Amino acid sequence: MPRILRTARVPGIVIKAGWAAALALSIVLAFASGCGRSGPDPLAPAFRVTVPAERAPFPTPLPSGRKEPGFVLRGTKGWAWTWDQYLAEIPYLARYKMNFLMSCYTSVFTDPVKFVNRWWEPLPQATLAGIGKVAAACRDAGITYCFSFHPALFSDRPLRYDSDEDFDEMWRNYASVQALGVRWFSLSYDDIDVKGRDIAALGAAHAGLANRLFGRLREKDPEAELIFCPVYYWGPADQGEARLYTESLGRALDKDIFVFWTGDGIVTPRITRGAAESFRKAVDHRLVIWDNYPVNDRSGALHLGPVVGRDPDLDEVAYGYMSNPLAPQNEINRIPLLTCADYAYNPRAYDPARSIGQAIRELAETPSRIAALKDLVELYPGNLISGSALTGYNCVLEKVASLVKEPGGRKLARRLISRVEGVAARLDREFPDGYAETKKTLAAHIAAARDMLSAPGPAPSIERRAP
């Protein structure tokens, strides 16, 4: 939801000390500065992937006697993706038993690159055409497409809750999308400034706006559905302003409206049943988990390891599970996304170590291609595996920054850079027509690492901040 992190002084780096707790379930990890050290080789990967010799059914099949998957809704969203990027992912969603795709509200911003949001203006015909293509492709593949909209974030004119004019301008865009045959919608109010606001009144106002929109949608289509993303979209909502807002929202919100929730935190190492039950009790509505993994907020970071730290029985509390992806690297995002699909389909049998190996095998046909993706994942296991709570956490550059501060560390840093260069070269050789955005990202990381290595004196400072 995008927590836009723009404070890194080195491209792709926004770092914070992370949790030391082991999150990997069946994966054994070694943590140290940056990506960790393992064994006698200080540059040996702390996270290792075992790719099976043969493919196995994937996602993990349901146990005998069980016919229904874990979560009812299982899928992903975009993140300022182009419509062609959404279209490219639909076959993978269908193949791996995902059934839900939501376009990010940033994709319909007036300027998705600069984050200009003039929500009151009619959606351009080119945007509607893109939505129409994605919605049609989803229907053909048996996938539910959901249109998302945010009438406040990055806008110099946030929607006024008591204004009929503002509502009608917002409704015009929902109506245009509904006319394309879309039946699922989202209204988002995440990440807005609420300082000094009457929080309980704000919850009621948001419920009123969502109810009004939902009523309009169902006038046109009695089977229309709406998911609302609240201001306090994380945590147990059991105290303070979060509780006041959430309970006020829940009391007034139409009972047929779903609510998004990201888990115990915003970008969180754990999503627990206890926190989910607490939040659901406060809001008293059906939940869709919006898992902020492997999202990088367009920071240049790569989070390629398996999703970990999600309780195996969350499907008993939440109706749906939606992953938040990398941007703009939608192709390489398929590796962690497939592990999310595996978890969402059969959470009780989910094994992250097995899942990441199977995901790589699904996406690569030859031993050399498998090895290229495996080595890339081991270089960039991601923030969950590395113990960080930041979407901009960059394992490679953090490691280089740490090494150049140590006596004799520059030699090791050169070796690490050489390793990244080798993986990048193999990715280019094995996939000449694929992973273009990932190749650009690796080139940027190599350049940034070289700059750190050549800089005299201490390593460049890296600003660390929480999301």
Regions found by a protein language model. Give the residues of each.
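N-terminal secretory signal peptides that target proteins for export/translocation
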Residues: M1-I15
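Bacterial N-terminal signal peptides
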Residues: A20-A30
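Short, low-complexity, disordered segments immediately C-terminal to signal peptides
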Residues: P40-R48
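Feature activates predominantly on carbohydrate-active enzymes
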Residues: F47-N173, A179-R183, R218
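Catalytic-core regions of glycoside hydrolase
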Residues: K77-A80, N99, E121-P122, R183, ...
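Conserved, mostly hydrophobic/aromatic
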Residues: L93, L187, Y321
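C-terminal functional modules
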Residues: R348-P467
